[in-house]
């Protein structure tokens, strides 16, 4: 399999030292030349637009659909802030893909909990972010496979 120019570029960026200055990161991001003054630079078309950091000094997330629903907008903003906060506060990272289980809703819910979106105040955020994913966010596998639930059902049926 032949690597594309983009694949080579991604590998080079991931291999960079974690102790880079912003200027070194800028040089690496633009492949050795300063593209921060180009408004429509090709590096801006990713979910996380770092071109915006060098061009305007802001961070831009380009992975959300437009919406007028206040709850969905709040959920998207909260998710972006939580991921940004984790990136700032995290001391170590591991570039490893998490395998998607047969239940994407459960996998994403555990990710949200790891980000700190726990508790009643984030219940609505989790609901909006999980509503379109297939599967049960509370259970990794089908509920009927859990012995504890089967025992509970049996006890309830015997009590009747």
Q: Whereabouts are the PLM-identified features?
A:
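C-terminal accessory/tail domains of diverse enzymes
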Residues: 1-160
